[in-house]
């Protein structure tokens, strides 16, 4: 079955996956925001807006390519994921 995700879900899943791969809630993005947006077939401004919303909601903090996950549970709720 094909699962369709919203932009917010895609970005949340991506951030959680990057955290898992880096074994840390504080990590650097390896691709540009443009490259990440293209991989989701969305516009760069949609990705940036989503990251700003996540930051405003207290889920993450960004500093350039650095991402810090502040509220993993909230981010997982957006991603519709559960801890494994």
Where are these predicted regions, by residue range?
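Short, Lys/Arg-enriched, Trp-marked, Pro/Gly-tolerant hinge/linker segments that flank
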Residues: 1-7, 24-27
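N-terminal positioning helix adjacent to the helix-turn-helix/winged-helix DNA-binding module
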Residues: 3, 7-10, 14, 32
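Phosphate-/nucleic-acid-contacting segments
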Residues: 18-84
């Amino acid at each position: 079955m094909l699962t369709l995700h919203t932009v917010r879900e895609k970005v949340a899943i991506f951030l959680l996956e990057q955290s898992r791969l880096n074994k840390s809630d504080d990590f650097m993005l390896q691709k540009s925001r443009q490259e990440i947006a293209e991989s989701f077939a969305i516009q760069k401004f949609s990705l940036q807006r989503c990251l700003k919303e996540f930051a405003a909601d207290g889920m993450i903090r960004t500093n350039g390519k650095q991402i810090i996950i502040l509220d993993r549970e909230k981010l997982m709720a957006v991603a519709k994921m559960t801890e494994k």
